[in-house]
Amino acid sequence: MRPLRIAHLTATFPPYPGGAGNTCYRFARGQAERGHHVEVFTATATGEAPDPGDAIVHRIDPVMAIGNAPLIPKLARLDSFDVVHLHYPFIFGSELTLLGRLRRRTRRAALVVHYKNRLMGKGPRGVMFETYEHTVAPALIRAADRILVLSPDHARSVSYLNRALEQTPDRLIEMPNGVDTDVFSPGADGSGLRERLGIPEDAVAAAFVATLDRAHHFKRVDVAIEALARTRNRDIHLIVAGGGELLDGFRSEAVAAGIGGRVHFLDRVPHGELPDVLRASDLFVLTTEPPESFGIVLIEAMACGLPAVATDYPGVRAVLDAETGFLVPPGDSAAVAEALDRLDDMGADGRARIGAAGRSKALRQWAWPALLDRMDEAYAEAIEARNAKLGAAA
């Protein structure tokens, strides 16, 4: 494939710890290493950002921002690119991208929409999100030359994606999240971290990784805490890696449940240090609910050889199966507790057997080189489709 000029549009980007931004970072850096000209357009952020390699990152002061929704007018005027790659959800970014398609120079670029998850919320925020999902999101999907979905299972659970799947199936391409299987791999034990946290050598430690802020309310660490309080085996501990304004409230919940000594909050952990946390653990738990659509931390844990307990709903169940862990109903702390007890009861050898199956699956399905190859193919299809549209309109 000839080198392309690629513009990535993303609401968040490292150092913000969200999965969508980290996925954008990995694709952008990997594409630049392959010789493409890559530019990332995102909002300014605080903190130390990882090296983007040869990718150019434009951190632009937004005119305004509502949470993780920055208004950056420049996004409507991106000329001279072969591909505009929008990472959804991106409130304001989606509208500006659609506005840009009205400009002759901008609409020459193929539009690729990388769909991560629906917008969902409660109260007035939920009403706004629902309106957005019935107006802007479907319009964006109709305009896209190619739509990248995390799994067909998840796409069928979203009405406008399911409609696109039925009407124009060639426009949808499965593009799961990826994991660096060299960085996230089984390794030396994390006895140092366990000792520092006061976790006994013969105890079983479950890892939970999430940003603990209001934007990630659906991660449901409260379900994991309640499940730990209900376990039959009292030697199970929970290591929570993640910071945010909700952390203190969750710490209070653990104390109120009488398990403050078995729940260990690390606050925010840099992404590069997550492998150490996972290697210090015996298993992984993901009690998230919609709109979570995949769970990057889940495949990172599996790549480290950990068996997992995860919520059974579209997207996540495309990742975890009976050979690699246990699926439980959303919000069911009793089912989570039972799964934790079963993993504890089977001992280290049983957990290692399940973890090895997860590691094997990560190597087969989510390693970055194969995903970068697939992205090149998706871009080629999008460019061909865009050229056909331009030719028909001439």
Predicted regions: what they are:
Residues P307-A310:
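Short hydrophobic beta-strand element within catalytic cores of glycosyltransferases
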Residues P138-E174, V179-P186:
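A short, active-site helix/loop in glycosyltransferases that binds the activated sugar's phosphate group
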Residues R251-V269:
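Nucleotide-activated donor-binding/catalytic signature segment of Leloir-type glycosyltransferases, i.e.
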Residues I141, R268-V269, D276-S281:
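Short alpha-helical donor nucleotide-sugar binding micro-motif in glycosyltransferases
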Residues S185-I199:
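A short helix/loop element that forms part of the nucleotide-sugar donor recognition site in Leloir-type
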Residues P200-K219, I225-L228:
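Conserved donor-binding/catalytic core segment of Leloir-type glycosyltransferases
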Residues A110-V112, L119-A143, R156-A164:
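Nucleotide-sugar donor phosphate/pyrophosphate-binding loop at the beta->alpha transition
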Residues D321-A322, F326-A334, R342-A348:
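Conserved acidic donor-binding segment of nucleotide-sugar-dependent glycosyltransferases
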